[in-house]
Amino acid sequence: MIPKVLVPIAHGFEEIEATCPIDLLRRAEVEVLIASCESKLEVCGRSGIVIRADQFLRESDLIQFDLLVLPGGPAVF
């Protein structure tokens, strides 16, 4: 079974804390889903880089994931 990882992102997230794990996990053929905590799928990170999430966090069935990767940033305070 292929592991599944959820990466929720919110406005102001630290891009490197999201993109590096996503890249490495996908290279390892792990299924990674990016979920927006915002009202839009496009989420702007701390440095102005915009990431398009796969779906909204509210639509995610958390029980189906093996791991959560939680990027930091001003949005987490």
Give the positions of each predicted feature.
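Extended, subdomain-level signal for the structured scaffold at the beginning of enzyme domains
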Residues: 1-77
